[in-house]
Amino acid sequence: MSGNSQLPPDVIGFICSKYDIILASTSPRRYEILHDIMGITDLKTMVSTFEENLDKMNYSTDPIGYVCDTSWHKAQNIIEILTDYEDENPNEIDKPKLIICADTIIIDKSGRIYEKPKTKEVQKKFLMKFCYEDDEPVNVVTAVTLIKWYGRENFELVPFRDETKVYFDNKIPLRILEEYVESGDGLEVGGGFKIQGQGAILIEKIEGDYYNVVGLPLNKTFKGLYAEANSI
């Protein structure tokens, strides 16, 4: 991703003058969206230690609830970390924080959740299903939980989500799909494809925010940050 098209620096400067902006994720794609595209050059990071082990069987009829709850639990874990830090450093005075927690899943028309394939064999099965078996798009859902943090006794959680429909090309030659799998690209992402990489070859079109498929809905995330900065 290129950082050539950033939002006006005075807008980002306004938000950053009110809050420290923190990404609670190790995802390089989410970092690039916020740092390179949105232009938050002083972006800080934290790591949630939530195990992301919610039982999917409890969400068989509500897969979107799974991603929303995962994002929410990540935020709750960050609150615990911030609270512990505040307890250990009672005299430290920090700027208020806006912390971005997120989780992304791929869902097919039946409600099945597709996670990281980890092996090329599983990845190929995923992509063949998306391209040749399903007659409807897959749904990419990112749930975001913003933490508006002033301190352990003064914080607020602001959840939102975005959905993007991804239409795979059912006429793509199998050889091309197999070559993509052999490239190793997409093994470590949900669904087994990267829209920002060679995986885009397999995709005919999308409906919704491109950056949501990458890992974070840029438009809704920016509006969330801007709204909170304006609420002071």
Swiss-Prot record:
Catalytic activity: dTTP + H2O = dTMP + diphosphate + H(+); UTP + H2O = UMP + diphosphate + H(+); 5-methyl-UTP + H2O = 5-methyl-UMP + diphosphate + H(+); psi-UTP + H2O = psi-UMP + diphosphate + H(+)
Reported effect, R29A: No change in activity
Keywords: Cytoplasm, Hydrolase, Nucleotide metabolism
EC number: 3.6.1.9
Site (described: Important for substrate specificity): R29, T104, Q196
Keyword Cell wall biogenesis/degradation: no
Active-site residues per Swiss-Prot or TrEMBL entry: D103 (proton acceptor)
GO cellular component terms attached to this protein's record: cytoplasm
UniProt cross-references to InterPro entries, sorted A to Z: ITPase-like_fam, Maf-like
Outcome reported for the amino acid change (mutating T104A): Loss of activity
Residue stretches spanning the membrane: none
Molecular function terms from GO: dTTP diphosphatase activity; nucleoside triphosphate diphosphatase activity; UTP diphosphatase activity
Subcellular location: Cytoplasm
Predominant location category: cytoplasm
Gene Ontology biological-process entries: nucleotide metabolic process
Documented effect of changing Y66A: Loss of activity
Cofactor(s) listed: a divalent metal cation
Additional record remark: Present with 1940 molecules/cell in log phase SD medium.
The family this protein is said to belong to: Belongs to the Maf family. YhdE subfamily.
Function: Nucleoside triphosphate pyrophosphatase that hydrolyzes dTTP and UTP. Can also hydrolyze the modified nucleotides 5-methyl-UTP (m(5)UTP) and pseudo-UTP. Has weak activity with CTP. May have a dual role in cell division arrest and in preventing the incorporation of modified nucleotides into cellular nucleic acids.
Protein name: dTTP/UTP pyrophosphatase
Source organism: Saccharomyces cerevisiae (strain ATCC 204508 / S288c) (Baker's yeast)
